[in-house]
Amino acid sequence: SVWAQQGYAVCVVDADRNRSATAYGARGLLGFDVVPVEAAAKATRSAQIVITDGQASSHEDELKNLSAGSDIVVLPTTPQARSVELTIEMSAILRGFGIRHAALLVKVDTRKQRFADEARDTLEGFGLEVLDGSIPLLAAFDKAEVQGVTVREAVDDKGRSDPRRMMGWAAYCAAANQLQAILKTDSADNLAA
């Protein structure tokens, strides 16, 4: 949604078995297309940015197929141990395929920042690139999903703007900006080579 707000043509391809992104997109107006993987070939033709929402899986063929042609794969990772372990497993597979990837810490409870710091240290200790910021755990994200809007537009039960929504929006803006910087650096490096 950050890139759509910046004027890019964005398409989210829902490759997750539970079709959560498609359901989210059907609830409201997100400002970008959300399509099931079966419709991706046609729907992504005019997109400048294609985001694939896939299921967390360490199945090699599935990861290879979903990440083929990607400029970068972002691995959303909660600070919980199993999520960190799964990200490390997926990273090893992606590294074996030579696919650029980075972890993004999500659902970070600011009251328990120590767990996020430990997760970051563990991921970096295994050689993973971890995006600088993290996405906070906020009720505004749940409200936005129910309403079918971006977190920036989330409102409470009385129709008032959720007071913490901009904290979530700012976190996604920072992650999007860092991803753009990474891709620009990669592009410049490829041109120089």
Regions found by a protein language model. Give the residues of each.
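Inter-lobe coupling/hinge region of RecA-like P-loop helicase motors
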Residues: 143-173
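G-domain G4 guanine-recognition motif of GTPases
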Residues: 78, 101-117, 133-145
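Beta-strand-loop-alpha "switch" segments that mediate conformational coupling across diverse proteins
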Residues: 119-155
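Hydrophobic anchor at the start of a short beta-strand
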Residues: 9-10, 50, 73, 100-102, ...
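Conserved Switch II/interswitch segment of TRAFAC-class P-loop GTPases
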Residues: 69-88, 109-112
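P-loop/Walker-type NTP enzyme "switch/lid" segment
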Residues: 1-68, 145-156
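Conserved C-terminal guanine-recognition region of P-loop GTPase G domains, centered on the G4
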Residues: 84-110
